[in-house]
Amino acid sequence: MATSSFNINELVASHGDKGLLATALVDKAAHEQLEEQLQHQRRGRKVYVRNVLSVKDSEVIRNRYGGKYDLHLTQQEFAPHGLAGALRLCETLDCLDSFPSSGLRQDLVLDFGGSWVTHYLRGHNVHCCSPCLGIRDKMRHTERLMNMRKIILNDPQQFDGRQPDFCTHPAADCKVQAHFAISIHGGYDMGFRGLCEAMNAHGTTILKGTMMFDGAMMFDDQGIIPELNCQWRKIRNAFSETEDVTPLVGKLNSTVFSRVRKFKTLVAFDFINESTMSYVHDWENIKSFLTDQTYSYKGMTYGIERCVINAGIMTYKIIGVPGMCPPELIRHCIWFPSIKDYVGLKIPASQDLVEWKTVRILTSTLRETEEIAMRCYNDKKAWMEQFKVILGVLSAKSSTIVINGMSMQSGERIDINDYHYIGFAILLHTKMKYEQLGKMYDMWNASSISKWFAALTRPVRVFFSSAVHALFPTLRPREEKEFLIKLSTFVTFNEECSFDGGEEWDVISSAAYVATQAVTDGKVLAAQKAEKLAEKLAQPVDEVSDSPEVPSSTPDDTADVCGKEQEVSELDSLSAQTRSPITRVAERATAMLEYAAYEKQLHDTTVSNLKRIWNMAGGDDKRNSLEGNLKFVFDTYFTVDPMVNIHFSTGRWMRPVPEGIVYSVGYNERGLGPKSDGELFIVNSECVICNSESLSAVTRSLQAPTGTISQVDGVAGCGKTTAIKSIFEPSTDMIVTANKKSAQDVRMALFKSSDSKEACAFVRTADSVLLNECPTVSRVLVDEVVLLHFGQLCAVMSKLKAVRAICFGDSEQIAFSSRDASFDMRFSKIIPDETSDADTTFRSPQDVVPLVRLMATKALPKGTHSKYTKWVSQSKVKRSVTSRSIASVTLVDLDSSRFYITMTQADKASLISRAKEMNLPKTFWNERIKTVHESQGISEDHVTLVRLKSTKCDLFKQFSYCLVALTRHKVTFRYEYCGVLNGDLIAECIARA
């Protein structure tokens, strides 16, 4: 930052030749100083730390993260080990900042063992693997559920439709694929190799993590991390606080050469003066982050780099590379700065003098004590008198003294249990030195036999000494050659890394591929940012919202599919076709693979979500029972999914089942599948129709079709259904629709019946074709094809063995959209062989045409080609569109002659509730109230669009949704809304018309 003051004389002297007056110089310097201060404040994001921190703790976190984040230490609440918790939040943000934050699926980040509710509330593009390894994990999940419920209840609009993205699987068992991962204090339970194996299972190449670090763990059995006020201690097992007194040599040997210890050693972390929860972790896992360098696993080599060690926290990164790794010596060392002023002293650990241990003592204390002991030693005095002299000096050098009324610490206090043994060891050391010096002197005057024995080679003398030690162990102190041990201030680890991974990794090709992918994604993000900036500039300043917007994933045909489950053995036929020299066959095979993977992930996500709820409610994989707080768990999940319910073995449901809803499957200890009335099971919204796994399996069993795909891309109301009716030939054709409602409409248009045997045989949904037996045909007529995934369309053609597909749809209306935000959808867009346009509408009245043109101009990026800029209407109705403001849902005029559409499910639910209050027939609120997405393809005389909230809703800004809403009517369209919504495309265009 700039200094807070400046010297006017120096400014004039240095700038006077430029002709500026003193006042101008002052103004210029003040402006520059202010700008620099503003830039300093803006350079980091705001991070609010609510924990109460001491002045010292505040300095620790500011020194570590103050330069990167705009820290706001609000001192709101006391929390257990508050600094560690505050650092954990900053560590999470710091590790996430290492990766792209585009919000695209290809930039998904995994969090091994993290807090999923933190990412959910902050809108992070993160999937958490949060396994339930014990009671503490289940307690944390329960607490997170409560926090999530509390936040959602305070601001339901912000979280409308959002689901927390996490699973309860161990990291190595989760199937979500992502290139990046973080592990915030999660490595204690996995170790270095465990993290590498989890990365391999997820297809992860870079992981960044943190953990508590103290190099003295390699030497000591206990210690303190002063910045965290944390004391650590090695114990042999979780139930016996016995010290690990393994000698240093044994510890280093075990560290370097052995992976197996006789007894499992744990490290207990306790926070000093805080009677709160402590932590116990396996020493082998912790040690692996200090000693290991690389690990080769399933064709990948993973290397760890220790990046920053600050405030007792080590930040590390693990990077996986494929292919061959040539031999290389990897070296790192761990320093022990806390023992540089100490020396090791061996003292007795047992009364028989057989067991000895090493203690640390200040070099200055030992040096002065030994000097006095050597000078005052007299072999004619009783050993106890000399022992008392040593103890007196030792006490004086390690106690508190008072000088001129001021207390001063002399040296360092010695453990009361070691004090007398230290003095005794110094006495023995002194006596041994005098005896050794005496023997050296006597050798000058020794007899010939003594001289001959002394002249023996050292190996012979060592042999005799070893024999005496083995036969007479209690004599060992007399022959002890070393009492003092020089303590090394570091330990070094060298490891040769070499791995034959098969093919060489083509880094150049990978760099070109990543660059191409990044350019494509960057253009998408730039367009989204420009659109958001234009929206903000068009809004009044006092109404700008600070809430973050998560960019939506955009299909990109230049990159590979990430996020699907890899099942190569089951995809051999389609996989081979993806390498076909015929481009369209390769494209169709790739799309079918993606569609199969997408449906499989939908199924896996459903199972994962239900298993999570089952476990939260106290269930397991063995018993058909739940033991948790059912009401609390299900009330919490009900806020995000109103279809969540529990069926008891008595046949009773916890909540009333909505009318007309029948659950086809349920979940319990036997997994997901059909259940009987006598079983205990749970359900959610995905259990009504659960056919994703079957669709995936069927698609995998097919081959990509080679027939011709023709698309008629027509405007809304151009007569697509009429065209299907005119060209349909029962002997050679089958009509396929995207959903059940469209199938019923086509059946009524062709056969005047929606459920007759003939109508159901010739007009079927795409799902019905794939899941049921059906005859082969030569031609498929597809209605509203844009609602289908390209892979599903190809699967339908393959199942029917059709040589031609004639597809009708509007490429600018609502297209197929993923129901799983974590899936990287890239090949869903239809790729036709032939395309024809139809720009004349017979449905939409005359005044709708200029409205849609205006919407296209405002919503679509400049340069975008749209057939709606030139479309025309043949309707005789000239004026049809009106709008009015309403105060609440009670003022919506519900009329059985009108068709009602909403943008959101919440508004639809409000209208249905209002219809029930007015005792309108069930057929009305079942068939006459739909969302815009559900009403695509529908044609009605009178349509009313209802918006009951003025909170942010991006659907009112999207051209495709607004286009569908405004083109469903033939006679009248009425827009009824509550309040003003910034960016409401329909309202703005109606106002300008």
Curated annotation (Swiss-Prot):
Keywords: ATP-binding, Helicase, Host endoplasmic reticulum, Host membrane, Hydrolase, Membrane, Methyltransferase, Nucleotide-binding, Transferase. It comes from the Viruses. Its EC number is 3.6.4.-, 2.1.1.-. It is a peripheral membrane protein. Residues 687-838 form the (+)RNA virus helicase ATP-binding domain. Residues 50-409 are annotated as: Methyltransferase. GO terms for cellular component: host cell endoplasmic reticulum membrane; membrane. One of its GO terms (molecular function) is RNA binding. InterPro entries: (+)RNA_virus_helicase_core_dom, 1a_necrotic_phenotyp-det_dom, Alphavirus-like_MT_dom, CMV_1a_C, P-loop_NTPase. Residues 839-993 form the (+)RNA virus helicase C-terminal domain. Signal peptide: none annotated. Residues 537-565 are annotated as: Disordered. Residues 72-290 form the Alphavirus-like MT domain. It is found in: Host endoplasmic reticulum membrane. Gene3D superfamilies: P-loop containing nucleotide triphosphate hydrolases (3.40.50.300). GO terms for biological process: methylation; mRNA modification; RNA processing. Belongs to the bromoviridae replication protein 1a family. Involved in the virus replication. Contains a helicase domain and a methyltransferase domain. The methyltransferase domain is probably involved in viral RNA capping. Involved in the formation of ER membrane spherular invaginations in which RNA replication complexes form. This is Replication protein 1a. It comes from Cucumber mosaic virus (strain O).
